[in-house]
Amino acid sequence: MSDYITFALPKGRIMRDSMELFAKIGITCPEMSGDSRKLVFENPETKFRFMAVRATDVPTYVEYGCADLGVVGKDTLLEQGKDLYEPLDLKFGYCRLVVAEPGELSRDEDPADWSNIRVATKYPNITERYFAERGVQVELIKLYGSIELAPLVGLAERIVDLVSTGATMRDNGLVEVETIGEITSRLIVNRASLKTKHQRITRIIQDLERVLAEDAGND
């Protein structure tokens, strides 16, 4: 199977967006149509394989060479810090990584005055780096879901989380006070694969660059 090019893709919307983009450069997999519960899909004619994995696991599959390429959010790459080649911003999956707090705190405090705070987040590494650069001492509480709940029940005064529209935060009485960064989906490549399958992988990257440039020109 070493002649296959293998992609690791997050299950759900990012996988669908990825396959729509790949189709524009002739990379397709008819086996993926429908609601299959399979986790590995192949196109024997074109020698492409696709693995459906958890978003946070994509970098690991690519790092260890189980996949040659992957698509993953920049937030995951920043949090995990793995040694991966990241040639392309794919321009979809846009959201923002923000610091948020209850509205009453926002009215009474200036973020510039923070010195020692408690923050709940799925992104402890990013959060620690961000506040360390500002000279703010932070106590981190790692959660895996429903981050907005933490300030409501007194677990933490503030949170760091991804937002797209911000509706969930507003519905829970939270306001964004700082933006850590803008997040989009990225193409990542295993460094060994880039050498052993250089021609095919380079062609994929170049074709995607062309399509992304064309799409940007049409906006």
UniProtKB/Swiss-Prot annotation:
<dbReference type="GO" id="GO:0003879">
    <property type="term" value="F:ATP phosphoribosyltransferase activity"/>
</dbReference>
<keyword id="KW-0368">Histidine biosynthesis</keyword>
<keyword id="KW-0963">Cytoplasm</keyword>
<dbReference type="GO" id="GO:0005737">
    <property type="term" value="C:cytoplasm"/>
</dbReference>
<keyword id="KW-0067">ATP-binding</keyword>
<dbReference type="Pfam" id="PF01634">
    <property type="entry name" value="HisG"/>
</dbReference>
<dbReference type="GO" id="GO:0000105">
    <property type="term" value="P:L-histidine biosynthetic process"/>
</dbReference>
<comment type="similarity">
    <text>Belongs to the ATP phosphoribosyltransferase family. Short subfamily.</text>
</comment>
<comment type="subunit">
    <text>Heteromultimer composed of HisG and HisZ subunits.</text>
</comment>
<comment type="function">
    <text>Catalyzes the condensation of ATP and 5-phosphoribose 1-diphosphate to form N'-(5'-phosphoribosyl)-ATP (PR-ATP). Has a crucial role in the pathway because the rate of histidine biosynthesis seems to be controlled primarily by regulation of HisG enzymatic activity.</text>
</comment>
<dbReference type="InterPro" id="IPR024893">
    <property type="entry name" value="ATP_PRibTrfase_HisG_short"/>
</dbReference>
<keyword id="KW-0547">Nucleotide-binding</keyword>
<dbReference type="InterPro" id="IPR018198">
    <property type="entry name" value="ATP_PRibTrfase_CS"/>
</dbReference>
<keyword id="KW-0328">Glycosyltransferase</keyword>
<keyword id="KW-0808">Transferase</keyword>
<protein>
    <recommendedName>
        <fullName>ATP phosphoribosyltransferase</fullName>
        <ecNumber>2.4.2.17</ecNumber>
    </recommendedName>
</protein>
<dbReference type="InterPro" id="IPR013820">
    <property type="entry name" value="ATP_PRibTrfase_cat"/>
</dbReference>
<comment type="pathway">
    <text>Amino-acid biosynthesis; L-histidine biosynthesis; L-histidine from 5-phospho-alpha-D-ribose 1-diphosphate: step 1/9.</text>
</comment>
<dbReference type="InterPro" id="IPR001348">
    <property type="entry name" value="ATP_PRibTrfase_HisG"/>
</dbReference>
<keyword id="KW-0028">Amino-acid biosynthesis</keyword>
<dbReference type="GO" id="GO:0005524">
    <property type="term" value="F:ATP binding"/>
</dbReference>
